[in-house]
């Protein structure tokens, strides 16, 4: 199934687009072939990323290649949608044949439309949305807490140190009591993270940071990710807990990529046997699956990420149907959930119909 999605469907889409480019552009065969070749090479860079080929390139070249490769998949998606709409229009006789063949005005219109969509998407991505959230404990707490929550930073070739620095400044401006990160801090390769010394940026955070692993830490290599978290001063919780003020318990789950991770009920039961005052339980679980199990275990609040809410429409429609909650607040019995669409991004830096965000919560 994954091979079909990653390889076969994109090849079919590129063939479909290439055919339309050949019949639509009023250019010589050489120019048409050159344009198609550029598109194919751009998309090929996406697979170079999976093969870690960028690690052998100069950092600036690797960053540019990553941007081109991961952006191409979104350009491909929108071109397919546009050509499908035009083809459907032709079938029902709403679009004349002349509109589709050797028509430079149509090609220019499509280019301008895509340019507008992606300029908007990039501006929207860079506008990080501050999401306020209320959390209420059924038990008494020593005081009120301000918590900043985030997920899916994906630092690396795509999100370099200068972007991470901007996020650190935004979080520090909130003056939180502590910070929670629900996985995927690292995008993939450790090379840009180490070469740009990104751990130094996390040391600028003015509050303690608690985090869990995401699936992308498994891509980068868990041992290397764990060492980076240690160097960055992040409290990494892998099926273990941290206690704040003898009343708030933060449990970080191993990512479900590890199929042998401990069940949430076992983690809670173990804590109940060791800690008498579990006044409020927070769980960090990167992927928002099996929410019923967190509810049954008596979790007060769970923070997740992973979905990105699809990043762009109409993929957001798919994620909304794949998950019980693909984004935002959700309540199940006495358990409150928040699934973040992420402060960072994987793929092209476009947010279309979704948002990049960080959560500022008040726990009372």
Describe each region flagged by the PLM.
Residues 1-6, 124-131, 191-199, 224:
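Short N-terminal secondary-structure initiator segments
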Residues 1-126:
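Non-catalytic terminal accessory segments
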Residues 103, 114-140, 156-162:
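Hydrophobic alpha-helical transmembrane segments in integral membrane proteins
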Residues 136-364:
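Soluble catalytic domains of enzymes that build or remodel membrane lipids, polysaccharides, and related
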């Amino acid at each position: 199934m994954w091979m079909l999605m990653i390889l076969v469907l994109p090849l079919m889409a590129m063939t479909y687009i290439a055919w339309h480019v050949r019949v639509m552009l009023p250019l010589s065969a050489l120019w048409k072939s050159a344009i198609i070749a550029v598109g194919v090479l751009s998309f090929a860079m996406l697979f170079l990323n999976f093969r870690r080929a960028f690690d052998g390139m100069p950092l600036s070249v690797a960053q540019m290649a990553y941007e081109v490769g991961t952006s191409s998949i979104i350009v491909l998606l929108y071109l397919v949608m546009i050509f499908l709409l035009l083809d459907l229009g032709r079938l029902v006789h709403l679009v004349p044949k002349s509109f589709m063949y050797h028509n430079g005005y149509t090609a220019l219109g499509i280019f301008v439309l895509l340019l507008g969509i992606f300029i908007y998407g990039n501006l929207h991505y860079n506008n990080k949305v501050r999401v306020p959230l209320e959390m209420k404990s059924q038990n008494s707490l020593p005081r009120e807490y301000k918590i900043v929550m985030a997920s899916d930073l994906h630092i690396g070739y795509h999100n370099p140190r200068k972007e991470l620095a901007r996020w650190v400044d935004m979080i520090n401006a909130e003056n939180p009591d502590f910070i929670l990160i629900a996985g995927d801090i690292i995008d993939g390769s450790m090379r840009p993270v180490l070469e740009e010394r990104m751990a130094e940026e996390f040391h600028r955070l003015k509050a303690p940071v608690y985090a869990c692993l995401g699936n992308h830490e498994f891509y980068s290599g868990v041992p290397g990710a764990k060492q980076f978290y240690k160097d960055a001063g992040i409290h990494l919780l892998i099926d273990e807990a941290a206690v704040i003020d003898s009343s708030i318990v933060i449990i970080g789950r191993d990512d479900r990529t590890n199929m042998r991770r401990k069940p949430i009920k076992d983690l809670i039961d173990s804590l109940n046997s060791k800690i008498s005052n579990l006044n409020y339980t927070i769980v960090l679980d990167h992927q928002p699956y099996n929410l019923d199990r967190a509810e049954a275990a008596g979790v007060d609040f769970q923070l997740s990420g992973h979905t990105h809410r699809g990043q762009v429409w109409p993929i957001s429609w798919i994620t909304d149907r794949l998950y019980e909650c693909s984004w935002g607040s959700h309540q199940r019995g006495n358990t409150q959930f928040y699934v973040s669409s992420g402060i960072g991004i994987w793929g092209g830096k476009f947010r279309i119909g979704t948002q990049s965000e960080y959560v500022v919560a008040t726990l009372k």
